[in-house]
Amino acid sequence: MRGILIAIEGINGVEKSTQAIRLKNALENKRYDVIYLHFPSPNTDTGKLILDVLNKIVKMPSEQLHELFTKHRCEFTAEIAALLKLNYIVIVDRYIWSGLAYAQADRIMIDTKNTFNPDYTFFLSPNKSLNEKPLHLQRLYETEEKQEIIFTQFINIINEVPKNKFCAIPANLNKEIIDKIIFSKTIKVFEKNLNLDYIKMYDGMYFNVHDLDLIHFDWQKCIEEDDGIDEEYGL
């Protein structure tokens, strides 16, 4: 028995954070245990540095920036592992898809070790031309040209993901409709995974939630190779 990891992804300006928070509130209203995480997070030194780079306060080579993003995601792996053990629904606003899409847009490969493969991902897709902010308001990656490249990389990722692991939603739908889609699918994923002990890692390994000891907390000891796990659990 474990919680689930739900990711909400998309390019800039499709209201990922809005939908993630609305999902959190809807689940809490139904008495579910929920945690919302946003990447990059200002709550760590790594996250603060990333935000300074994105806001063009600090300059950094692209390769170094993506290494920093990877490190930042891994900073939360232990926390997510504990929350899954405690049967929480963990909502992440940007996660590994964003890491891959933005890195690939810069023609950089990143390490996916120690990163969870979300149980389900919602991709908010723009179905109109992207609006470019005035130059003085643009953060790093926010030019229309760059966002188009990043969007293409997201589509490349989606094409490799099993169809039962994600849902693409037009971002300009009525918010109440988007709410219902995301909420209902999240509940279905939670109920489906109630009896599972494992969650898949993005590098193909598996994390055994059942064996995680929250007293002598060493989550890395619970990572296993696929020894029939995928076939047995349908992960």
Curated annotation (Swiss-Prot):
The keyword Kinase applies. SUPFAM superfamilies: P-loop containing nucleoside triphosphate hydrolases. One of its GO terms (molecular function) is dTMP kinase activity. It comes from the Viruses. ATP binds at G10, I11, N12, G13, V14, E15, K16, S17. Its EC number is 2.7.4.9. The keyword Protease does not apply. This is Thymidylate kinase. It comes from African swine fever virus (isolate Pig/Kenya/KEN-50/1950) (ASFV).
